[in-house]
């Protein structure tokens, strides 16, 4: 089986940075314990990234995943997830007697602050994203009153837009660039003027999606590897499938539909921004063995 593997597959800068920060806290805790000091409790606030294998590995190291601020105990070292958290939660975390390490992706943090600046200038946010995604909940916390979220152009068309309101447009950092531009054009037509835009979709997302499209146009089937909870991985699968090629999204090689793939001559392989290289490698080896 011939496999074309995306060069952009695997950890992005934001994920790598978040994991390095968490690893540093784990290492420091182990060093203190080795010196005879009590081992401090390490936790993340929400899943550090959306990958089940990575989360399982950290759980095996004793890292807890907290969901509520009141779960934080005195002396805890708490690492904020790569997706960021609502600013009210961050303030509450920092009010606890704990060490708080912010592992929010720098691209997400930039989006948060950009949204806050626009809203302070009197504009109202139109956010292209998944309403229930943790990054989106965090972004909205910087937007104040009146912010509107839409997950598609169809949803945008159904929003109660007011002609007298000064809007600005932003997106979840891992959103589909093409769909974002369609939304931008629709707003221009609907409101009769260009809406100010925050360019919040990160370059890594754009490059991954474009490479997935390019590969999908050359192959008989496309395999996308990554957590089912990972929004950026789901969108890679979406943009690949939109090219008309059979596309499957799996979390590891054991989930591959072997019989459907066996007859393919060339298979494309890409992976989400939170997928470890070891899982991508294992998937590639399995595909090449078919």
Curated annotation (Swiss-Prot):
EC identifiers of the protein:
1.17.7.4
For the protein in the UniProt heading, the enzyme class is oxidoreductase
Where on the tree of life does the source sit, at the highest rank?
Bacteria
Is Transport among the key words of this record?
A: no
Q: Which residues bind [4Fe-4S] cluster?
A: 12, 105, 202
- Matching Pfam families: LYTB
Binding annotation for isopentenyl diphosphate = 50, 83, 133, 230, 232, 274
What name appears for this protein in its UniProt entry?
4-hydroxy-3-methylbut-2-enyl diphosphate reductase
**Which species does this protein come from?**
Nitratidesulfovibrio vulgaris (strain ATCC 29579 / DSM 644 / CCUG 34227 / NCIMB 8303 / VKM B-1760 / Hildenborough)
Q: Its encoding gene is what? A: ispH
